[in-house]
Swiss-Prot record:
Coiled coil: none annotated. This is GDP-mannose transporter GONST5. Residues 33-152 form the EamA domain. It is found in: Golgi apparatus membrane. The lineage of its organism: Eukaryota, Viridiplantae, Streptophyta, Embryophyta, Tracheophyta. The gene is GONST5. Expressed in rosette leaves, flowers and siliques. Pfam families: TPT. Keywords: Golgi apparatus, Membrane, Sugar transport, Transmembrane, Transmembrane helix, Transport. It comes from Arabidopsis thaliana. InterPro entries: Sugar_P_trans_dom, TPT_transporter. One of its GO terms (cellular component) is Golgi membrane. GDP-mannose transporter that may be involved in the import of GDP-mannose from the cytoplasm into the Golgi lumen.
Length: 341
């Protein structure tokens, strides 16, 4: 009896620890990226994304090949180009759009907009795959959309370009989720193996555009910045932490239930919003805060509805279900793929 009690306490402690370290890495990566764009004046989102991809490629190789902390999931060479490469392309676009939006709009606004991802995923699955969704799923999306509309209307630091980048980032995230269900069918990828295969492709895809479009700007920045080497160390550290974030996602998925994962994910957004406001002091109106709150409550309610419907007895109409390991595919920068690098 006492052993059972100790085991439950250890399980709860491990779950809490996994959530806290996930929050810590996620919030730190977001704040560091915003700091790089705003405080260090390094306004080159393609290069920032490329650094993150390189660090993640190296980190995944070390974890799987050197330290052997995770077994390698073997992928047929043909499937790497036929399945992994298209996923890597969408993944690359998703991360770049997230960093572009972070350059132009506050963290609080960007994180709130990304909460639209469940809605865009449902709509795309309905339009493209003609999947059936219970009316309760559609109803649960109303507060999410309403909250984001209220937040957008009342945002004091609104920027059209940043808003569009975040919005298209949601569409890219949703597309990635839908593609994962078909292209990665048969492969049980965890977040580390996903990074191992996709990050090198993403580096290859983004390397040339980053070099051609941002090379001159980076050289000018390097000459004008008072301490460029210190800034580059911060940039490199943000890439290392971005990989650590993926490792923390694997840990939290293994240590929590689906409901806990959903609630913790939405609370994580609230933590990121609060911490970013404490650091950058971007103006937030009362109605803007209300809109953000409505959105987060709506996301939590949406997760609850999906979980409730997934537990229905066989034979009862069910909604399409996304496995938890596809809910947050390698957010090398932002966490939610329903986020994420």
């Amino acid at each position: 009896m006492e052993e059972g009690s100790l085991w439950r306490q250890w399980t709860m402690f491990r779950s809490l620890l996994s959530i806290l370290q996930w929050w810590g890495f996620n919030v730190t990566v977001i704040i560091m990226n915003k700091w790089i764009f705003q405080k260090l004046d390094f306004k080159f989102p393609l290069s920032v994304s490329c650094v993150h991809f390189i660090c993640s490629s190296i980190g995944a190789y070390i974890v799987i090949k050197v330290l052997k902390l995770k077994p390698l999931i073997v992928v047929d060479p043909e499937d790497r180009w036929r399945r992994i490469f298209p996923m890597s392309f969408v993944f690359c676009i998703n991360i770049v759009l997230g960093n572009i939006s972070l350059r132009y709009i506050p963290v609080s606004f960007m994180q709130t907009i990304k909460s639209l991802t469940p809605a865009t995923t449902v709509v795309l699955q309905w339009l493209v795959w003609r999947k059936y969704f219970d009316w309760r799923i559609w109803a649960s999306l109303v507060p999410i959309v309403g909250g984001i509309l209220l937040t957008s209307i009342t945002e004091l630091s609104f920027n059209v370009f940043g808003f569009c980048a975040a919005l298209f980032g949601c569409l890219a995230t949703s597309t990635k989720t839908i593609l994962a269900e078909s292209l990665l069918h048969g492969y049980k990828f965890d977040s580390i193996n996903t990074v191992y295969y996709m990050a090198p492709f993403a580096t290859m895809i983004l390397g040339l555009p980053a070099f051609l479009l941002e090379r001159n700007g980076i050289l000018d920045w390097f000459e004008a910045h008072p301490s460029p080497w210190s800034a580059l160390i911060i940039l490199f550290n943000s890439g290392v932490l971005a990989f650590c974030l993926n490792f923390s996602i694997f840990y939290v998925i293994q240590s929590t239930t689906a409901v806990t994962f959903n609630v913790a994910g939405n609370l994580k957004v609230a933590v990121a919003v609060f911490v970013s406001w404490m650091i950058f002091r971007n103006p937030i109106s009362p109605m803007n805060a209300v809109g953000c709150g409505i959105t987060l409550v709506g996301c939590t309610f949406y997760g609850y509805v999906r979980h409730m419907l997934s537990q229905q007895q066989p034979g009862t109409p069910r909604t399409p279900r996304t496995p938890r390991n596809k809910m947050e595919l390698i957010p090398l920068v932002n966490d939610k793929l329903e986020s994420k690098i």
